[in-house]
Amino acid sequence: IRLSLVGSEMCIRDRPSTLSIDLAELLVDTIHSAEWAIFAKNGSDAVSLAMMTARSATGRDKIIMYNGSYHGTHTWMRNAGDPGIAAADVANTIYIDWNNLQQLEDAIAAHEGDIAALIATPYMQYTFADNVLPAPGYWNDVRSICTAHGIVLILDDIRTGWRLDLAGSDHYFGFEADLICCGGALANGWNISALCGKDSLKNACSSVSYTGTYWHSAAPIAAAIATLTKLREHEDACGYMRMIGESLTSGLESISAQHGFHMVTTGEPCFFSIRLADDDNFVLHQEFIAECVKRGALFAPHHNHFTNLAETMEDVDQTLIIANEAFSAVASQHPDMGFTA
């Protein structure tokens, strides 16, 4: 990374590098469904390119996405009625409920021959609500339906990539996506994202005019190579992150119960969400978060938490000590609610 930065200072930081070839080959070798890769700067870029690729490949306009999902900041990826979003921005978006195959089939029947793609995260990662895993067999059914109707299946793996399975979250859930959007952990915080796909869509992707400022900077590409190499060299990177998450979530559930609370944890252990039951206005949850922050542990108020290879069991133990103190403090603030300080 340092060499990439120094070299870039001799000219401009945003310049092509042979490292991009190395990273593309590494991604193809790592992700089960990937046969090519192209790079951008953030998740929205990768998702937007995936949509354009699907439309170019199929000659169709409409996209299916799930209610409550999030796929970036570009207007055509948002939800109807969101502030700043015009009706025309989402005129070609069809919204269905997660885990509802009948709604998917009905949407396709209502727009037969007009649907370019279906886009989804590996499982639903709601804000202010529990995560929801795919029902047994759901992804295989979705894959079969998309194939039967010539619909491109796009997996938004921006946040879950390399956490569930180094080979891709579609591999983890037992299906193959046509296009996979990567980012998040790709370069361990450096600004780079990627779109990977099947050979059948390579020409369609190549036909799309798509670029951006700083997209070809060598340093983030070098960081991505270093990150993926580190993950691949680990004996079981995803297994380790799962173990850390399981220890943390089971500990939180147990400690909360000791104080009379009910901590609900959902999602996969390496990428989980928490909330307190019987707390519809999130007051107790916010108080718990605040007490943890005071003591040095930061939890996301209403969204997912990530585990990583840098975390140790000592970190988990310290976090649970803080959580215990935080629950005690919240219980003390509500003596009439039956909690145990």
Task: Identify the meaning behind each predicted range.
Residues 1-12:
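Short, small-residue-biased leader/transition segments that mark boundaries at the very start
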Residues 12, 173-204, 216-223:
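Active-site PLP attachment segment
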Residues 22-120, 124, 137, 246-249:
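PLP-dependent aspartate aminotransferase-fold enzymes
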Residues 227-253:
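Structural signature of PLP-dependent enzymes
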Residues 232-233, 291-341:
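PLP-dependent enzyme catalytic core of the Aspartate aminotransferase-like
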Residues 243-290, 310-311:
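Conserved PLP-binding catalytic core of the aspartate aminotransferase-like
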